[in-house]
Amino acid sequence: LSAWADKGWVPDVLGVDYAGLIAKSPHTEGHEAHDHIWKNLRAISSEFKILLLTASQVNKEGYNSWYLSKVNFTGSKGIWAHANAAIGINMSEFERDSQICRLNYIVLREQEFLGELPSKYVAVAGSPHRGRFHLISRFI
C-alpha cells in the first residue's frame, strides 16, 4: 500500500482473506498474537483511510445461532476492540436453499450517533452467483 500511496494511488477498499490466516509474529503468542494482527489491520485502515474488510470463523455454537454475537467467536477480544463494525452473516438450511442470508451488527463503534444498536436483522436475497442481491426486509 505504501508503494502505491507514494505513486498517488490508494484503494478505497482492501479485502483481507481472512484475518485468521495472517501469519503471527514470532514474538507473540495466543491472544496477544491475535490482538497484534487486529491492531495492525486497524492501523492500516486508519493510516490509508480505507475500508478494510476481512472475515473471521464462528465457533460451533455460531452454526446454530439465529443472530451472531461476540460469544460466537473464539480468540482475542482484540477483534472487538479494533473493529469499527463487525457484521454477522448467517443463514439456515432453508435460507441457503432460497439464497437468503441474514446480516446483523455484532459491534458498531460510535453507535451512540445511531442510538441503540439495532437488535433485529436485515435479510438479503438474490442470486449470489450473478452478484445480484436484493433487500427483502429491514432493521425493525
Which role fits each region the language model picked out?
Residues 54-57:
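Conserved H-loop
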Residues 12-49:
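Helical hairpin unit composed of two closely spaced alpha helices linked by a short loop
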Residues 1-15, 28, 46-48, 60-140:
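C-terminal regions of RecA-like/P-loop NTPase motor modules
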Residues 21-23, 59-62:
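Short, active-site-adjacent cap segments at secondary-structure transitions
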